[in-house]
Amino acid sequence: STVIEEHYTILDKVIEMGYADKIEVRYNSNGIEIPDRLLEQWKHFQKVRFHYSVDSIGEMNDYIRYPSEWEHNLRQFELLDTRTSNNVEITIACAVNALNIHYIPDFLKWKLTHGFNKTNMWPFGAGGINYHFVYWPGHLNVKVLPNEFLDKTEKKYEEFIEWWSDNWELGVPSWHKGKVTKEQWLDASYGIKRLRGMISFARSEDWSRRLPEFREYITKLDKLRGTDFRTTFPDMAYLLDEPDEK
């Protein structure tokens, strides 16, 4: 369940006491279940901020957030984007880690071209996605990735930034059209500045000595779950090879 039963009781009590229109409620959730009951309760509050925890698209998100199913995520995206009241803000909370940093441009392009109504629209994430880093365990921290791989990732980011710069208005909702300039978009903290900042953070320390831990972790996960990292993350497949196997 998205929330425990007691949460509904608390919301009902706040509504009953007449305080709801003075209160902001925030959630960080994987959104597995979002019942109609909760949607109705949200309508009474001054503001509801729902940070939907999704880390990638398709099979990549299924792998990172095992055992999630992308088709279910899509249904929840649709529900949150179209069935929530106007006082509800929806953002994507992406945990940037060693498995998904290379594929963030794919996630962003999917989000920008999906045709969302209000999900993570300007000014949130500059109309893209909101991010935070995974710091622990160390073998999933982006600093574990070798520089030669980060070179490829940086190249991918710069190619995407060029595309996003040409299509920046995709993340600006109808109610902000004509009110946001490209200069403002370029200067946004969570836009292209954030993307380049992620690469800088990944290069800030060299933790590639922990790659053996990364390989062991992924290999054990695949054996336990019946998943296939190499197939799911093809650009990263070679990172599982021992140095003398390359």
Predicted regions mapped to residue ranges:
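Core AdoMet radical
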Residues: 1-7, 15-36, 43-75, 88-98, ...
